[in-house]
Amino acid sequence: HTFDIKSKVTRKMQVPLDADGYIPRIRFTQDPNKLAIITLNRHQNRLDMYFGDPRSTVCKQVLRDESDAYIKEGVFDNIIFYPENFSFVSEKSGYNHLYWYSMGGNLIKQVTSGNYEVKEFLGWDADDNSFYYISNEESPLRQAVYQIDRKGKKTKLSSQPGLNSAQFSTNMKYYMNRYSNLNTPTVITLNDNTGKVLSTLVTNDNLKQTLSKYSVPQKEFFTFKTGDGVSLNGWMMKPVNFSASKKYPVLLYQYSGPGSQQVLDTWSI
């Protein structure tokens, strides 16, 4: 339903829904006459997006995405609306990649491609038609900040290995880069949109000094194969002064739920 704050009138939107379908997200666009309404079937493997007119209540379908398994929840946060376009991420190519649509629902182009995943769309710079995003192109254990220009040239902006995230200014000219890795607590820098570090905001040097006084076990990455031949990543922490000739009790932790990657090159205790 929509509610007109001036007329005090409530209107029911004409959203096509399966008997067991539901609406997981409703988003404002930059057009007051287009309300983005996203629906899923109960199996959660078919997503439809409609633009609804709050006054007429008519809803027009502008996008459908389907999966053999399920639609990841992260797709919702990567839909960003601009005056003439919107972004969308999908696994329809086999990997999670970024797509660029017109507000009429026409696919303009697939922005990214390759055997890696786009983890987050950061934004679009209208001045030079550049896209900014985070992906795990280097390793499934790491994430870096990238830019793709109007000609499709890709540039890696983050310089430190590990897990990088970024928050851009409204005009897409600056961003805060937050990163850590297995041996480095969180560091936050202010960068321009070429990746140049303008200022270091957080170093966590005091924390590193404090930790140096203690014998803290370090994580070690390893890989193993499942019974059906799939390679998986893991990490282990051995006791301080570990001896391979001794036996130790083992605490094993494993969780395979969606959106829950546990093995990452990031700092934690």
Where are these regions (language model features)?
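Serine-hydrolase catalytic core recognition
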Residues: 32, 165-269
